[in-house]
Amino acid sequence: MKRLIALDMLRGYALVCIMLDHMPLSELRWFTLANFAIFDAAELFVLLSGFLVGMVWLSVETKQGRRAAQWRFARRAFEVWRALVFGGMLMAVVSAGLLALDMDHTAIWHQYAVWVLENPIGFFGVLASMWLQPNLLDVLAVYVILLASVPILVPVLLRHPISFAAGSFVLWCFAPVLNAFVPNHRLGGLLFNPFGWQLLFFSGIAMGLFRKQIIPALMPHRRLLTILSAGMFAFGTTIVIAAKFGEPALPIRDALRLIYGGEIGKWDLDGTRYMAIMGASWLVAVPLAHVMERMAASRLGVALQQIGRGGLFSFLMCVLLSVLGDAFQMNPLGQGIARRMAVDIWAMVALWWISALWLTYGAPWQMSVRFRRETKA
């Protein structure tokens, strides 16, 4: 499978945004995606992950058969679950270490540090059962559920794409009601509603599976689609920017509220957010495709590619670095802009450096271990 450098760059950009967004005192968090789009880096990462799943499935099924593709994503669901469990333990230990050094931080709940020290086995158990999803890692719980469904549902999507899309939409419509029945430590189900976010994830998968059929079919209508997509993105951007102006922009906000209904929830995946990111995906894939390729080939783009290619490992590192960065920016109190900016830059460089090391040493080692296991089997 040929890698798409723009895809890797965007995945890396999403991870950098996620890291900065989780650092409350960050100076650069005011320039992340969420500040000029109605959706944020979490939606971008889930959509791109779905797209990558579709591409990989198609490649593996073509070369090795459907059973191999199903097994690959069943194993991947386990790997994400394992990352959720051990990442949660490690994050709690890091938090406990920071508190022991009298370094306050607000990126994660302090109670995790208490639990991992007082009852590590119990804390491991609630993570392993996914009864508890620590903040910053809670999106992985949804990702586990969605990936676990891939071996069963992707064959259905391939065989009955229209019926699958209709079913996915109906499930999204009832997402808030269904999520309340999911066993969880908090009332109302998982924070990231899997019944809502499946629409975005499987939209990405469909784009990856059928991109060679979809793009040629849509190209005759590219002008209209570009206008509609740009309009949808601009609509969402106007909502976000108008909210920042407060009272002076109240007439504009009231007018916009008549269209979108007054509330745009993230956790159930509001329709406005979904349409905005789908519109943005068309803009990136078609009218801005060459621009994205040039950006991805630049030095900064290559660095973001390396972060994006780190995948799950890079995600865990971005979470841990956001906790450390938050602590460094809070302690001592009253830091100036220059010092907080220095921490932002340190966190981004560290994420890139660790991701590059992983690609150079960690990923090849992981592949060799997997190859030896498959050879013995």
Residue positions per predicted region:
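Alpha-helical transmembrane segments and their immediate juxtamembrane cytosolic regions
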Residues: 1-377
